Amino acid sequence: MSSTLERARTAVATSPELRRLVERGRAILLGPSDEALRQEQDESHWQPAVAAGSRWWQAALSALSGVVGATVIAASAPRWRLAVPSWRLSIPGIAQPGNSTQSTMWFLLGLILIGLGWLGLVYRAGRIADPRRAVVVVGAVIALWAIPVSLGPPLLSNDVYSYVAQGEMASRGIDPSSVGPVELGRNDFTSGADPVWRSAPAPYGPVAVMAARSAVELAGHDQVAAINFYRLIVWIGVVMAAIGIGMIAVGNGLSAAVAIAIGIGNPIMILHIIGGVHNDAIMFGFLALGLAAAQRDKKKLAVALIAAATAVKLPAAVGLLYLGWCWRGAIATWKERVVTTVAVFASSIAAIVVGCFFVGLGPGWITALTSTGKVNDTYSPTTKLGFSIAEILNGVGLDVNGQLLASGVRALGLLATAAIAFVMLMRSPRVGYIKATGVMLVAYVLLGPVIWPWYLVTGFALLAACGLGRYRPSYLVVCLAASWFVWPTSVVSMGTVGSGYQHLRGLGVVVLVITLAWGAQRFAARWERRYHGLSTTEREAAVSSELAEVDSTC
């Protein structure tokens, strides 16, 4: 046996092809080499040079663009047709329109303005010399953008009506994980809940249900007031997330202002998380603070915070997995890693069970997660691919069950997600549990059965706090594109517009986004190869000479 191993080692050592193959396999499973990690770290830690002048007008212009865009979207957003109309869910002095076409056109204009403002904010955040001042400026601009979308009706989603209905159920002693809001009978809470979820149990944990119950009870069981109280809870979650992302970025030697601008100031966060009043903000806040605490070696506090995030939405549990695996550092044995991971999960499960008992929540919220996978009109690549193949086959005369085919492709996507989870588990001692958590959250969303824009925020923001490096252009493109995936037509996915070959057209949109991200990446790489390392004066001179050459040839 030993002689066979020796011959294998000799063959690998003497064959460049075999050596490259072994190194590639090792990099896939265990991560890049120390030299590659140092190179990636240098690229991730690169920050743009601070401009000589303050140029506050650029920051002001970005802030103005974003606030105008947010105001346009909030002022033109239609009310949820099944909710009881109330002036308390509108911008004072502005009547909410009922025309979805008009709302959509204003939405597109507003989204362009917010997108431009966001890109400008990211650009300026890295060019303010004082780090503390940069964080204050970025935080103030994001808060300014969030105010208009917090005054109008809930944007681009009706989920908050279901949240407060579940909170009303919990306040009456009804378990929202076993029955849907229809159990409340006829009232404002039931009528406001989306018919899709009116009979469905809540797929949210005890912390989410307790937050909804608190909002309802503070509001005196008034539906509209409960929504506004829930908005306040979402704001608290966003602030927690911003603090956590900033702390993680500083711990990684990066600019907190840039990380917050990218991860918290993006259009998805402003329009979908804050404007749509999603409980993902609560999960995000606890998870970001927990990972930041672990980074500062406060691991028991980290487990408590990440367990709280898991008690909002179950996907946050990946943070527990990678934290437990990396608990004892890079030189721990497999046995030590398994023991600490089991201990982390056991303590977290015990805490969540106690929370469920306190709130009066059964285990149905875990099994209720499968109900979200029944939605087919999202931009999940696996869902679109399965239904698109069925549409093509049906178009040529073959009778194919699209739902069955899509289920098969979704299963393959989940298998790929499990494979990525294992690879990141092996890599996590080298790349870090924070980056591993971010990668896994993004992979789970992209390969899962359902994608809504607000699902992407948490993973993307964690990656931004770890340093996007050369991947920043594709990140910005995907984040901007995902903001367009839902239109304000109470609520209509962009893929449902028009008729015929709906899923095939949706798959085309996904392919277009991937192509644009790839193109932005290639363009930025070319630009970096040509101009990176030059001083500002040299870079401007190089660009000017190229423009002069173009003018001379025209």
Put a short name on every predicted segment.
Residues 110, 208, 212-219, 230-244, ...:
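Transmembrane alpha-helices of multi-pass, membrane-embedded glycan-processing enzymes
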Residues 318-349:
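Perimembrane helix-loop-helix junctions
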Residues 133-137, 245-266:
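Transmembrane-helix signature of polytopic, membrane-embedded enzymes
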